[in-house]
From Swiss-Prot:
<feature type="modified residue" description="Tele-methylhistidine">
    <location>
        <position position="73"/>
    </location>
</feature>
<feature type="modified residue" description="Methionine (R)-sulfoxide">
    <location>
        <position position="47"/>
    </location>
</feature>
<keyword id="KW-0558">Oxidation</keyword>
<dbReference type="InterPro" id="IPR043129">
    <property type="entry name" value="ATPase_NBD"/>
</dbReference>
<feature type="modified residue" description="N-acetylaspartate; in Actin, cytoplasmic 2, N-terminally processed">
    <location>
        <position position="2"/>
    </location>
</feature>
<dbReference type="InterPro" id="IPR004001">
    <property type="entry name" value="Actin_CS"/>
</dbReference>
<protein>
    <recommendedName>
        <fullName>Actin, cytoplasmic 2</fullName>
        <ecNumber>3.6.4.-</ecNumber>
    </recommendedName>
</protein>
<dbReference type="Pfam" id="PF00022">
    <property type="entry name" value="Actin"/>
</dbReference>
<keyword id="KW-0206">Cytoskeleton</keyword>
<feature type="modified residue" description="Methionine (R)-sulfoxide">
    <location>
        <position position="44"/>
    </location>
</feature>
<keyword id="KW-0067">ATP-binding</keyword>
<keyword id="KW-0547">Nucleotide-binding</keyword>
<keyword id="KW-0488">Methylation</keyword>
<feature type="modified residue" description="N-acetylmethionine; in Actin, cytoplasmic 2; alternate">
    <location>
        <position position="1"/>
    </location>
</feature>
<keyword id="KW-0963">Cytoplasm</keyword>
<dbReference type="GO" id="GO:0005925">
    <property type="term" value="C:focal adhesion"/>
</dbReference>
<dbReference type="GO" id="GO:0005524">
    <property type="term" value="F:ATP binding"/>
</dbReference>
């Protein structure tokens, strides 16, 4: 599809915003979902200091800014800052005029109704888009894997959801949310590295720990056995060079960190692990469709990128499910961006073109149109 009239696809996550053009196979812009404001107004005269910074620029100037994440646990909580992020997305990252392109936005499962209306209102009234649509993130991930029925375990920076989907429709009564995701794992890794004698406390150091997590952590197939191996040999140790040249060694922390996904008690949480949450979601569904869900369990989001996570999910869910059940965990290599990719696929389908909410429909019905057209 031509960039000229291509739809824009914007996936706003708690940690990162992914944006680009429908028909592309990957997002053109990926930047942190943060808005920063100067802590001290006008320290430097004539610097042309802005009153707010978004994304990477906010990240790089974080020393002089107060940073805010407008999306908490997948749900927008600060609309003024959210508007700034969208403005930055259209004008600075994609360099397009939003009034010339249809816009596909994504939303968290179980997003409050008022929130979808607010998104719709901002798109039509602030950005004057000709058409828009709001799709549920997990459903897009399932489309990206080439399916319309299955259960998606979507885990990002701020929240994890298990979403059973049948023939393209999410089943709201069976969706479960777990407030344990990437940011919590980064914090936990900071904590256990401190126990080893390395001190990471500031927000800048948190970014370093996030990098350590992304490069060195993995999920053990058998946690107890892995702990024993780590204790008896140094075969699992890896070294990491900090920005100042200091080299640190990390051993059992490599798999203790993501183990919290399966044992939230590590973080002092009483919730079920991701395997049990997935199983519980399936059990809330009609008995006739469970077989299809077990055989189509799709992982999605950055926090599912750990090596070993699919094998471990397979093992854990097999232990919970009926013994004759066929269980298949699908972990597509591009799952970090599969929500965006699903949006790109959906928005470029010829059959989808009549699904858009047009400016005209919005003007006739107001923001509540979103509940009738997007489900």
């Amino acid at each position: 599809m031509d960039d000229e009239i291509a739809a824009l696809v914007v996936d706003n996550g708690s940690g990162m915003c992914k944006a680009g053009f429908a028909g592309d196979d990957a997002p053109r812009a990926v930047f942190p979902s943060i808005v920063g404001r100067p802590r001290h107004q006008g320290v430097m005269v004539g610097m042309g200091q802005k009153d707010s910074y978004v994304g990477d620029e906010a990240q790089s100037k974080r020393g002089i800014l107060t940073l805010k994440y407008p999306i908490e646990h997948g749900i927008v909580t600060n609309w003024d800052d959210m508007e700034k992020i969208w403005h930055h997305t259209f004008y600075n990252e994609l360099r397009v005029a939003p009034e010339e392109h249809p816009v596909l936005l994504t939303e968290a499962p179980l997003n409050p109704k008022a929130n979808r209306e607010k998104m719709t209102q901002i798109m039509f009234e602030t950005f004057n888009t000709p058409a828009m649509y709001v799709a549920i993130q997990a459903v897009l991930s399932l489309y990206a894997s080439g399916r319309t029925t299955g259960i998606v375990m979507d885990s990002g920076d701020g929240v994890t959801h298990t979403v059973p989907i049948y023939e393209g429709y999410a089943l709201p009564h069976a969706i479960l949310r777990l407030d344990l995701a990437g940011r919590d794992l980064t914090d936990y890794l900071m904590k256990i590295l401190t126990e080893r004698g390395y001190s990471f406390t500031t927000t800048a150091e948190r970014e370093i720990v996030r990098d350590i997590k992304e490069k060195l952590c993995y999920v053990a197939l058998d946690f107890e056995q892995e702990m024993a191996t780590a204790a008896s040999s140094s075969s699992l140790e890896k070294s990491y060079e900090l920005p100042d040249g200091q080299v640190i060694t990390i051993g059992n922390e490599r798999f203790r960190c993501p183990e919290a996904l399966f044992q939230p008690s590590f973080l002092g949480m009483e919730s079920c692990g991701i395997h049990e949450t997935t199983f519980n979601s399936i059990m809330k569904c009609d008995v006739d469709i469970r077989k299809d869900l077990y055989a189509n369990t799709v992982l999605s989001g950055g926090t599912t990128m750990y090596p070993g996570i699919a094998d471990r999910m397979q093992k854990e869910i097999t232990a919970l499910a009926p013994s004759t059940m066929k269980i298949k965990i699908i972990a597509p290599p591009e799952r970090k961006y599969s929500v965006w990719i699903g949006g790109s696929i959906l928005a470029s389908l010829s059959t989808f073109q009549q699904m858009w909410i047009s400016k005209q429909e919005y003007d006739e019905s107001g923001p509540s149109i979103v509940h009738r057209k997007c489900f």
